[in-house]
């Protein structure tokens, strides 16, 4: 009896077992993206902490984004790699719940953090003379803390609401992670409409409210850029905000597709490829998007390498 109970408390994650010839390729790509994510985001945090020239609100928020991305990917990639190397993965319910909580918390925190970064850029471009007074270190800490707290709150709320829904057998997930839309597909019918509507409303708030803030912020930036007289300032503003918009489009496009559709319409086979993009690919691209054309970050990297070289020569 105990064995039967423990079997019922596990989820079978099929991952990409329907495409066996694709699994070795995906394994290599996912591992490469994961290494790029850890390396790129760690380097970004190191540079921002060590170089006084990067002690500004923009890089403070970028550090938090780097930490979110590294944690978000780490909550997903290890079981995904295990799944790609072998047969379908059996995951205990406790592990599944922990993964769901972590990915929801970090993904939600990223939604809010991207909105905070958009507000920061709008303040820098639209109010350059008052920027230092508006965006104080205390405000930066408050906004960053609010991003993490919002993510944690949404994660706890969504997980608690999901726990109210009884899940029907077989507990088979055509996915590589315990993602909310895939788990909702297993929920039994009946009295769950109210709970599901509450969960959907929470997802709308955590996704669309920050997205609206982002659109409004970059609308204000666009108006300010059009009024600029100097082409140099216009190019800097467009370059900085353009990189932010690229990251926003990559993340929000796939996240909105995944989370803002009814559970009945959710296609697991298509959904796992979309999820692969925003959980693995986007975190690997973010350090490149934000730093590839950033002269301050490149300068900080050169200074760090020179200091390390002098240290080695001194020994």
Curated annotation (Swiss-Prot):
Which segments sit on the Cytoplasmic face? Answer: 49-56, 120-138, 220-236, 293-315
InterPro entries xrefs: GPCR_Rhodpsn, GPCR_Rhodpsn_7TM, Olfact_rcpt
| Annotated membrane topology | Multi-pass membrane protein
User: What Pfam families would the database entry show?
Assistant: 7tm_4
Keywords from the named record = Cell membrane, Disulfide bond, G-protein coupled receptor, Membrane, Olfaction, Receptor, Sensory transduction, Transducer, Transmembrane, Transmembrane helix
> What Gene3D superfamilies does the annotation carry?
Rhodopsin 7-helix transmembrane proteins
Membrane-spanning residues: 25-48, 57-78, 100-119, 139-157, 196-219, 237-259, 273-292
SUPFAM superfamilies per the record?
Answer: Family A G protein-coupled receptor-like
One GO cellular component assignment for this chain's record is:
plasma membrane
Q: List the disulfide bonds.
A: 96-188
One GO molecular-function entry = G protein-coupled receptor activity
CDD domains for this protein? 7tmA_OR2Y-like (cd15433)
Biological process according to GO: detection of chemical stimulus involved in sensory perception of smell
Name the PROSITE patterns for this protein.
G_PROTEIN_RECEP_F1_2
The free-text function statement in the UniProt record for this protein reads:
Odorant receptor.
What does the similarity note say?
Belongs to the G-protein coupled receptor 1 family.
Please give the PANTHER family that the UniProt record associates with this protein: OLFACTORY RECEPTOR
**Name of the protein:** Putative olfactory receptor 2I1
Taxonomic lineage of the native organism: Eukaryota, Metazoa, Chordata, Craniata, Vertebrata
């Amino acid at each position: 009896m105990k064995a039967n109970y423990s079997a019922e408390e596990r989820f079978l994650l099929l991952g990409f077992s329907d495409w066996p010839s694709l699994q070795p390729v995906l394994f290599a790509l996912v591992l490469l993206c994961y290494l790029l994510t850890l390396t790129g985001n760690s380097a970004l945090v190191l540079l921002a902490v060590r170089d006084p020239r990067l002690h500004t609100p923009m890089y403070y928020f970028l550090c938090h984004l780097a930490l979110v991305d590294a944690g978000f990917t780490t909550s997903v990639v290890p079981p995904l790699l295990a799944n790609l190397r072998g047969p379908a993965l059996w995951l205990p319910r406790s592990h599944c719940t922990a993964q769901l909580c972590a990915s929801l918390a970090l993904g939600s925190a990223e939604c809010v953090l991207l909105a905070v970064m958009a507000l920061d850029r709008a303040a820098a471009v639209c109010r350059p003379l008052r920027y230092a007074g508006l965006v104080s270190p205390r405000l930066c800490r408050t906004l960053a803390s609010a991003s993490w707290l919002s993510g944690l709150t949404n994660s706890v709320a969504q997980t608690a609401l999901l726990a109210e829904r009884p899940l029907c057998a077989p507990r088979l997930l055509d996915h590589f992670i315990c993602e909310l839309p895939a788990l909702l597909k297993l929920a039994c019918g009946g009295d769950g409409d109210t709970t599901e509507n509450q969960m959907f409303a929470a997802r709308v708030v955590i996704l669309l409210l920050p997205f609206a803030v982002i659109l409004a912020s970059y609308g204000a930036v666009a108006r300010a850029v059009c009024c600029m007289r100097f082409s140099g300032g216009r190019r800097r503003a467009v370059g900085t905000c353009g990189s932010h918009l690229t990251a926003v489009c990559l993340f929000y496009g796939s996240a909105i597709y995944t989370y803002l559709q009814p559970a009945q319409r959710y296609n697991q086979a298509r959904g796992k490829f979309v999820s692969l993009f925003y959980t693995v690919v986007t975190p690997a691209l973010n350090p490149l998007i934000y730093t590839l054309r950033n002269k301050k970050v490149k300068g900080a990297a050169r200074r760090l390498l020179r200091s390390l070289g002098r240290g080695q020569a001194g020994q």
